[in-house]
Structures are given as C-alpha cells and as structure tokens.
C-alpha cells in the first residue's frame, strides 16, 4: 500500500467531524524479513477541538505524522483556518512563502513538522487530505475524497460520515447515524 492511500484509510475511519476533535497518529516504517517495506500507524491520540499530539511507536522509525482538524468552525464562536495547516499564515493573517514555511518553528502544524523534519498529513473539515513537506516547504493536496463536514462552506465533496454507536447495555445492537 503506498503511503498516501494508507493515510486515507486511517484518517477516514476517525469520528472527527461528529466529535469536533482532533486526532493524531504517527506513521512508521516496517521492514519485513524479506526486505519488503510496509507502513503502519500508532493508535490515534484524541485531542481537543484545536490541538493534538501524535502517539509514538516504541521500536519503529517514524516517517510521518498524520492528524485531523475537527469540525468546521464556521458556526462556532472561535474561528480557525480549518482547512489548512496551522502556521501557514503570519500574525496579520497573510500566507507565508515556501521559504518562510521552512523556517517556521512555532507551536503549530508547520513548526512541529519542521522541528521533527518529517512529512505531515492533514485531513480538513472540507474533505481534503493535504501533505506538508518540511524539506521544500510545499503543501500538496493528496486527495479531495475524505469525509467532509456538511457545514463547511468550502466543502469539496459530499462524503459524510456514517457513525455506528453501540446501544447502551447491548453490545449486539447498534444505532447508525
């Protein structure tokens, strides 16, 4: 499985929009006895509506991190730039250049990726999967096919999340939303 498809599989299974929480995980490399390289991910840490730190593997090399932004903040008191990596704008709200991105070291998505020198993937409320490469400062859209928040005014698809929740006291019955 190529890495972006792997990320899509992992991140499409989280309940970020319904819960309006961020989730974060580390992507790590596995080399089999026959030399074949594969990837896996750590159990996703659940954060709050605006931040989360990825869980880390014990014995494997981290090659990237992946996280989600919560639900769209369009109807919230506190507004965020939901559909982009944090750290992509300066204090005046203007986008920073690729060269400035590579130097960013604040406590934000771009700064964190730069400090650990690892690629970072982000799933946004509008349904896009983005990749930030700290080596060259580039942000690319990997996919526009992720689950999206119907409230997001910049929604790029009609993919909604079906959430299955166990009915209290009966593990054999589920409610589907």
Predicted regions and their residues:
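Short Pro/Gly-enriched beta-strand edge/turn motifs at strand-loop
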Residues: 5-12
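Short consensus segments that form the blades of beta-propeller domains
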Residues: 13-19
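A generic fold-level signal
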Residues: 19-21, 115
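Short, contiguous, well-structured surface segments enriched in hydrophobic/aromatic residues
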Residues: 22, 26-32
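Betabetaalpha-Me/HNH-type nuclease active-site subdomain
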Residues: 33-60
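Active-site-proximal loop/helix of nucleotide/amide-processing enzymes and allied scaffolds
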Residues: 51-177
